[in-house]
Amino acid sequence: MSGKGKVHGGKGKSSDSAKASTSHSARAGLQFPVGRIKRYLKRSAQNKVRVGSKSAIYLTAVLEYLTAEVLELAGNAAKDLKVKRITPRHLQLAIRGDEELDNLIKATIAYGGVLPHINKALLLKVEKKKQQK
């Protein structure tokens, strides 16, 4: 005998003080799934490159921020048109209305329509006619 008294097997804390497991998203304070993003990164990495957990958290935070930004602008566009549901048209108006998002998102949005655009030369003629009257 080693003389150390009763020895229980295993390492760590006793079972009565075991805490519940928390997700990576909860620890990072995010709504988007960090574990899923990490899995996608690992799957798409070439030559079995190692993917750090902080890179998945950072990418998830960026995706969550961009989504929140687009949804906020689209919600404002829907509110301006006095409707309660965001449609692809509202997303189109929100993205094309913001210069930075327009540069970032070059994709075509299905059923988004087109932005109304009137050439400045045509606007000047209308304003001159109004001033003459």
UniProtKB/Swiss-Prot annotation:
GO molecular function annotation: chromatin DNA binding; identical protein binding; protein heterodimerization activity; RNA polymerase II cis-regulatory region sequence-specific DNA binding; structural constituent of chromatin
Among the GO biological process terms of this entry, one is: transcription elongation by RNA polymerase II
Composition bias type Basic residues, residue spans: 1-11
Can the keyword Nucleus be found in this entry's annotation?
A: yes
- Asked if the Swiss-Prot or TrEMBL record annotates the protein with the keyword Acetylation, the reply is yes
Q: What does this protein do?
A: Variant histone H2A which can replace H2A in some nucleosomes. Nucleosomes wrap and compact DNA into chromatin, limiting DNA accessibility to the cellular machineries which require DNA as a template. Histones thereby play a central role in transcription regulation, DNA repair, DNA replication and chromosomal stability. DNA accessibility is regulated via a complex set of post-translational modifications of histones, also called histone code, and nucleosome remodeling.
Oligomer and partners? The nucleosome is a histone octamer containing two molecules each of H2A, H2B, H3 and H4 assembled in one H3-H4 heterotetramer and two H2A-H2B heterodimers. The octamer wraps approximately 147 bp of DNA. H2A or its variant H2A.Z forms a heterodimer with H2B. H2A.Z associates with the VPS72/SWC2 subunit of the SWR1 chromatin remodeling complex. Also interacts with RBP1/DNA-directed RNA polymerase II largest subunit.
What is the protein name given in its UniProt record? Histone H2A.Z
What species is this protein from? Meyerozyma guilliermondii (strain ATCC 6260 / CBS 566 / DSM 6381 / JCM 1539 / NBRC 10279 / NRRL Y-324) (Yeast)
The gene it comes from is HTZ1
